[in-house]
């Protein structure tokens, strides 16, 4: 079995057949980004439903030697949402759960596919993002594409080699979280994001 077919078969077992898109007509919507630039048609668009599925899909890509790109809502204007040649696209829009919210701590943990505008509905009167109001796209895409975000309190990350790691801002040592905003997925895929509320103003 060639690598593309093997990866698609594995992804269907991991995510369910309905969440692995291979028909060219259906894949065409994943070719462009927020500026309507077009990339190559991916071999498949894979829509995992949670962190374990992302971990397994990335591990399958590594095992089969299949290149992959990661996409949220596809609104990026920096090319980060475009497919790679002869590869697959991991699409995170199914991952829209609010994992935990603490009004007392002014923190919220969400999956990467949550729209930024939805955060205020979970914890009222808190401000989570600089920039447009409401911000477009997804929380994961905003973090991956925007350098200098300073209110990330924690990340659950699937690394490019398929390993899972949990990072917290209070952890001693190097600031690994600080390297993640603006990395465009090169540092891994954030499958859960903890944000601290920004100061008023």
What are the residue ranges of the model-derived segments?
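FAD-binding subdomain of flavoenzyme oxidoreductases
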Residues: 97-101, 108-201
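N-terminal flexible segment immediately upstream of the FAD-binding catalytic core
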Residues: 1-59, 75-106, 135, 144-145
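Hydrophobic/aromatic ligand-binding patch that stacks against planar heteroaromatic rings
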Residues: 60, 80-81, 122, 179
């Amino acid at each position: 079995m060639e690598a593309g077919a093997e990866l698609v078969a594995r992804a269907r077992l991991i995510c369910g057949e309905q969440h692995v898109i291979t028909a060219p007509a259906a894949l065409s919507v994943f070719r462009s980004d927020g500026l309507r630039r077009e990339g190559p048609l991916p071999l498949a668009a894979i829509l995992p439903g949670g962190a374990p599925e992302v971990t397994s899909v990335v591990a399958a890509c590594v095992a089969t030697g299949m290149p992959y790109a990661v996409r949220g809502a596809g609104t990026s204007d920096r090319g980060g949402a475009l497919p790679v040649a002869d590869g697959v696209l991991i699409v995170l829009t199914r991952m829209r759960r609010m994992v935990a919210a603490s009004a007392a701590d002014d923190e919220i943990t969400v999956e990467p596919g949550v729209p930024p505008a939805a955060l205020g509905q979970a914890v009222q009167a808190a401000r989570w993002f600089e920039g447009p109001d409401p911000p477009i796209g997804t929380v994961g895409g905003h973090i991956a594409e925007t350098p200098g975000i300073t209110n990330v309190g924690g990340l659950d990350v699937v690394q490019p080699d398929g390993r899972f790691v949990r990072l917290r801002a209070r952890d001693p040592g190097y600031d690994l979280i600080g390297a993640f905003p603006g990395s465009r997925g090169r540092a891994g895929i954030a499958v859960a994001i903890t944000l601290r509320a920004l100061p008023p103003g």
